[in-house]
Amino acid sequence: MTDTLIPNGCKSNGPVENGYFKKGCNPFAQTGRSKLQNKRAVLNQKIIKQMRMRAGAENLLKATSNNKVREQVVLELSYVNSDLQLLMEQLEGLNSSVEVYQNVQESSSIPLIPLGLKETKDVDFSVPLKDFILEHYSEDGSNFQNQIDDLMDLRQACRTPSRNNSGVDLIANYFSQLSFLETRFFSPTRQIGIFFTWYDSFTGMPVCQNNISLEKASMLFNMAALYSQIGTRADRQTLAGLEDAIAAFQKSARVLHFLKETFTHTPSYDMSPAMLSMLLRLMLAQAHECLFEQITLPGIRNEFFCLLKMAQEAAKVAETYAQVHQSMIETPITKNVPFFWTTMSQLKINHYNSLAHYFVSTALLDHQLNPSDDEDKQEKALSQLYDAMPEGRSPLDILKNKDERRRIGKAHLQRSIMGHEEAIRTHCRCRHLQKLDILSDILRASLNRSLTKFEQNDKEDEFTDYMLAPDIISKTEKKAEMEIPAATKVKVTDLFQRLGPLSVFSAKQRWTAPRTIRLILQDRDLGFTLKGDAPVQIQSLDPLCPAAAGGLKEGDYLVAVGDTDCKWMGVSDVMKLLKDVDEEGINIRVVSMMDSSSQPMATKSATYCGGLSKTYSMICLAHDEDDKNPKSRKVAKKPSFLSFGLKNKKSSSTLSLPNADYSRPWNRPSANYSNSHHESGLY
């Protein structure tokens, strides 16, 4: 999507400035990426409609005993299931449309796979937040209408982020605001009437919750998806572009890892632990592929040691994609992974393995062991290439015997040719792969190069002794690792900071209504002292002073002096306001903290229920854009996905989420974060 801006006087979509924020892309811009997102939104609505029809038909089938009605319902169910299948195939096609995300100047690089952004429905924060501000903070919610509008505009902008670091900063900004919002408005003792609806990016199934953790998890997924799109868009014909692509994919992997480790019970397939593990492997594999391209970009010298090194590097790329492919075909997620993705990973396994065999064959066929060469060094390099030497021969025998070098080199060429042919067959099996002309050209050029090499070394009168070339041990000098996103540099200001310091004025704390007390000095004495940071507390209260008689209590928080709000003032600033009090005195406002331990825990609302419908929210069946206010609906209460962590009493509960008010959580050092992409480190 082009980085067009919403015409509102904002020039870019960076951090908050002067109390406002910058915008995302123009949602009406008709670009390739925006068209795909619009199609995804339309498909999601069609899937909802078919799911409602199927749920209604299944309920009718259970309720009726009339055979004629049952036959009609069964027939209708078959139509609905057929329509659902078609819609799922269309959604899979959107996830397979990777060509619009590639760099327009790419002409010799294999396309990469980006993640699509999750779609969501609009959320109206206005009424619930104003009600909560009035009930909980005893302030007029209308005074915060501008801040609420800013929050809603910020969320709307995050639905169409620009495909660059500014778009990432925009999502990171909103994610931090969500942490502020959670602390200020989402109380464990009561439900707030805000429902978040998000659609699964692979199945299109909606999930609806009134838990802000679903919103935070979905924003992290979109941040990882945006990083993957940035990496896909990079110009891989330049070193700078390859560095950008590597960094973007590694940052995407880091965000996915944080999402997987933090939000452990998300009720949608695309954010399940198994799916996130696969996506994380995919991002690291693509980062490693870019590292390989970075090595090959200046050109590969036709030199013995260089060719063996490149063979092991190519084998390493194939190995990483083999791990990705294995995770794609595992039972929990294989039915939801696009066929394009599995075939693309299989194709890259064959392609890079074939490249590895081609490099080894070139090293053996084009070079001979000369007296001036370092014999020990070549012997060591060749011995490290295989687990077991071909036909039990020693490395030195192969290096010194010209015929043996030629025979083993041709065997590697044969494996290279077979691998390239298999890659082309894999390419022909998937209609979405067939649309990628660049990929087809690369595969055929690689095959022709191996065939030409084989013809140059094939003699008509030569007796062909067929042998199978051994596998090549993978090895790399540069390893793809998860990288901390640069979005940690975004400075965020709490939109609702006027409510007071978060450490005191939060949703989990309860106070009395503000009390107005007339403060009159006696012999220039207040009758009490102040302590603490903002807001200050009353201490050492003289029970005989006029303030105590007016209702002031020990431990009260001073929130206003006269018409001046002093929630954010320290002791020295408040004393400056009180030192000039005349004989008539001045009004002060105080609040007293109440014991909240006796408050009952709020019941979690339903999130999803059963079957293909295991990711489908029953709330979504009763709500849509054109429906009435959700408050008028009655929904059966069930534990949310976060309550599973409490039920099982696990130490790593999803309720213990990091607070992003000072720094991004994925930037914090943690023993749980491994920098290795090996299975033992990540999974």
Swiss-Prot record:
GO terms for biological process: negative regulation of stress fiber assembly; signal transduction. One of its GO terms (cellular component) is cytoplasm. Residues 649-683 are annotated as: Disordered. It is found in: Cytoplasm. The keyword Disulfide bond does not apply. Its main location: cytoplasm. SUPFAM superfamilies: HR1 repeat, PDZ domain-like. The keyword Glycoprotein does not apply. Residues 26-100 form the REM-1 domain. Residues 515-593 form the PDZ domain. Interacts with RhoA. This is Rhophilin-2. The lineage of its organism: Eukaryota, Metazoa, Chordata, Craniata, Vertebrata. The gene is rhpn2.
